[in-house]
């Protein structure tokens, strides 16, 4: 049963069922479709609506579809880490395209959403036109990234009990977004899969990797781009992992990339 906060948050969202999970999503605008996949502890609203991405992309003539990942926002909450394997979350993305009868789409993910997008790109190359990996660079391959301490922080009795600085940041963010802390702890424990270098080279679609110049979570965009047959790196100036999301330079780079411009 959804909480009052979830009901209010999901009032304008559509829903469908997949893998026994209810997935909520926004669908706005007309034109070539782009699907937006948010990061850990975020939502479609927080990651894409509030920072102006939905408005920017619809104004550019795109149909914008943004889902709440399982365990997040108005979608179903699950408490088994195995339910959050990146490949299973990529299946939610594929099922969303099927539900909307979309043969292909552009896909943009941020942080965990970029990881999901990468798994989708590898599993369903025919369904992908172009991809944007925001807030995730070479750590997609080398496995460094969000630490296990985040799960401990989410399970702590209160924010005051969390001493780890990264854990405090994510606990505070999760509380701000009124997230289910237990579901998020399961998610962070279950979604840390990597791709091998060989698997990355099999992603043939054009990919833009955009990482903030002060991001200490994502890893190098240039190193990941060098592995991709059609990879392109973009450094978001003066931004860390959290502040890069709504950056104007990031938006401009994505619009150029989606339009096929250098």
Range-by-range predicted roles:
Residues 38, 105, 109-114:
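Conserved alpha/beta-hydrolase "nucleophile elbow" surrounding the catalytic nucleophile
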Residues 239-251:
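Catalytic histidine-centered segment of alpha/beta-hydrolase-like enzymes
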Residues 171-196:
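Hydrophobic, aromatic-rich cap/lid helix
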Residues 203, 209-211:
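Short beta-strand/loop motif that positions the catalytic acidic residue
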Residues 21-76:
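Conserved HGGG/HGGXW glycine-rich cap/lid loop of the alpha/beta-hydrolase fold
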Residues 216-221:
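Conserved alpha/beta-hydrolase "acid-adjacent" motif
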Residues 49, 56-59, 66-106:
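Active-site loop/oxyanion-hole signature of alpha/beta-hydrolase fold enzymes
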Residues 115-123, 127-158:
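Flexible "cap/lid" loop of the alpha/beta hydrolase fold
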């Amino acid at each position: 049963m959804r909480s009052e906060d979830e009901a209010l948050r999901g009032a304008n969202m559509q829903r469908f069922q997949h893998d026994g999970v209810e997935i909520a999503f926004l669908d706005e605008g007309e034109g070539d479709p782009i699907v937006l996949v948010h990061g850990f502890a975020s939502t479609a609203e927080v990651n894409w609506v509030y920072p102006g991405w939905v408005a920017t992309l619809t104004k550019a003539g795109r149909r914008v579809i943004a889902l709440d990942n399982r365990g997040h926002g108005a979608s179903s909450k699950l408490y088994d880490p195995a339910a959050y394997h990146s490949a299973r979350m990529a299946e939610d993305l594929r099922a969303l395209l099927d539900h909307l009868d979309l043969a292909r789409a552009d896909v943009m993910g941020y942080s965990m959403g970029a990881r999901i997008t990468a798994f989708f790109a590898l599993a369903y190359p025919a369904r992908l036109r172009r991809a944007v990996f925001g807030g995730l660079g070479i750590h997609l391959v080398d496995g460094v990234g969000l630490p296990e301490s985040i799960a401990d922080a989410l399970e702590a009795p209160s924010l005051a009990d969390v001493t780890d600085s990264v854990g405090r940041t994510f606990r505070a963010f999760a509380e701000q977004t009124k997230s289910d802390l237990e579901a998020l702890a399961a998610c962070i424990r279950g979604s840390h899969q990597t791709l091998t270098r060989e698997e990355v080279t099999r992603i043939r679609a054009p990919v833009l990797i955009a990482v903030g110049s002060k991001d200490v979570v994502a890893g190098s965009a240039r190193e990941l781009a060098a592995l991709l047959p059609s990879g392109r790196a973009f450094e978001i100036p003066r931004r860390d992992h959290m502040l890069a999301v709504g950056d104007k330079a990031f938006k401009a780079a994505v619009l150029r990339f989606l339009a096929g411009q250098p």
